[in-house]
Regions:
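Generic structural signal for well-ordered alpha-helices
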Residues: 3, 37, 60, 64, ...
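Short, well-ordered coil/turn segments that N-cap beta-strands
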Residues: 11-16, 44-46, 71-75, 109-114, ...
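Acidic-and-aromatic substrate-binding clefts and catalytic sites of carbohydrate-active enzymes
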Residues: 25-28, 51-60, 84-85, 122-126, ...
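Short, acidic/polar
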Residues: 27-40, 91-109, 154-160
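Beta/alpha (TIM)-barrel catalytic core signal, keyed to glycine-rich beta->alpha loops juxtaposed to Asp/Glu
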Residues: 121-236
Length: 236
């Protein structure tokens, strides 16, 4: 496994990361999560990405149990904030960012995350408030760096222009050989500003592995065969 720097930061990450959407804390239990995590470590992967909303917090909880068995300095841990955790807990306000980072750290059983990401933009909160809150999280030692997922170039630019705010080091768009829209504007803009790409769905939920055939049922041991997880396949 090769390694790269995460944007303009000092964080070195493996080119391949292990994510947890649709799996850990949902259709995949702790025993299998631990097996996957150990296999990732054995392969040289040091980058693990999750989000508070995955499994309603369950993905972070399961990984917290699994990762506490590894030296904290041996891996890079990323999580996210934005989507609803309850009817009233959502968004990127100062209150929510501080509340949700603390909740994520408790579930993950760690004092800090290496990367804290805005899971989506929040049009209801001034960008200045969001960026200031993210900066406060970093200054408090609860996150080393910040990033975003699925922001437009205009939204990224607005965040970068907030005075004295922490700068983004990562972008997480959907990007794979089927969906290449980020190549038009997002990736070139990020390259100019020292922002790395951490893509989600790089294998299009497994479609690009070749294990799913048109008109045939999915393999029994695949996520697409699970009633808990096959809804994500509808887009393909």
């Amino acid at each position: 496994v090769k390694f790269r720097q995460l944007g303009d930061s000092q964080i070195g990450v493996s080119e391949i990361s292990l994510g947890s959407w649709l799996t850990y804390g949902g259709g995949v239990g702790q025993e299998q999560t631990e097996a996957c995590t150990r296999a990732a470590f054995d392969a040289g992967i040091n980058f693990f990405d999750t989000a508070n909303v995955y499994g309603g917090g369950a993905a972070e909880t399961v990984w917290g149990e699994v990762l506490k068995g590894f030296d904290r300095g041996s891996y890079v841990l990323a999580t996210k904030v934005f989507f609803p955790m309850s009817e009233t807990d959502r968004g990127l306000s100062r209150e929510q960012i501080h509340k949700q980072i603390d909740a994520s750290l408790r579930r993950l059983q760690t004092d800090y995350v290496d990367l804290y990401q805005c899971h989506r933009p929040d049009p209801e909160t001034p960008i200045e408030e969001t960026m200031e809150a993210l900066t406060e999280v970093c200054e408090a030692g609860k996150a080393r760096e910040i990033g975003f997922s699925e922001w437009t170039v205009e939204q990224i630019e607005a965040g970068l222009e907030v005075p004295n705010a922490r700068k983004f080091v990562s972008s997480q768009p959907q990007y794979n050989m089927i969906w290449r829209a980020p190549e038009a504007e997002l990736i070139p803009f990020c390259e100019q500003h020292g922002i790395s790409q951490i893509v989600w769905s790089p294998l299009a939920q497994g479609v690009l592995t070749g294990k799913y055939a048109p008109g045939k049922p999915p393999p029994e041991d695949s996520r697409a065969a699970s009633a808990e997880m096959n809804w994500a396949m509808d887009r393909y």
